[in-house]
Amino acid sequence: MSEIVDLGLSFRTLSSNITPQGVTAHYGGPSPWRGFRTDHNRCPSIVRSWHAYHLSKGWSGLAYSAVVCPHGTIYKGRWKGKRTAANGTNPGNQRSYAVCYLAGDNDPVTEPAKRAFHDAAHALGQPLRWNHAEWKSTSCAGDPIRAWQRAGWPPPAGTNPTPQPPSKDWFDMA
């Protein structure tokens, strides 16, 4: 399970008017990494800066339910039971949680990020279902996320091993 981090973001009043039917994947616009993708220490400050930017626009705060970073950490945004402001349409915000990848449009979706997307969706109680462009005409969620979606949102290899059936010895212990 990916680590879920609560940065203690302060929100203005958030609506609980949401009837989620899935999770919409987003990316954060231009890449924030500029060659420093390995610097996980930058992730919390980038999430906080997005929150401050959204507040400056008069919004209630970070528009996303959660943010996942390339290193596999999930940062709580509005979280479960709160309406998003990220999907671009009233139906999108009503029917879907929004999980944003802390990356740009051409940044690859790392294996830890794929695990974090799946874990965030599980924690929100909904399946990964849409990319942002399915709600509104936009370049978001970028080609790498769209390609991952077209492939069926596969989780990283080796993260969901099939357990071996019990051996004869296990049954003989009874």
At which residue positions do the language-model features occur?
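Extended, low-complexity, turn-rich repeat/linker tracts enriched in Gly/Pro/Ser/Thr and Asp/Glu
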Residues: 55-59
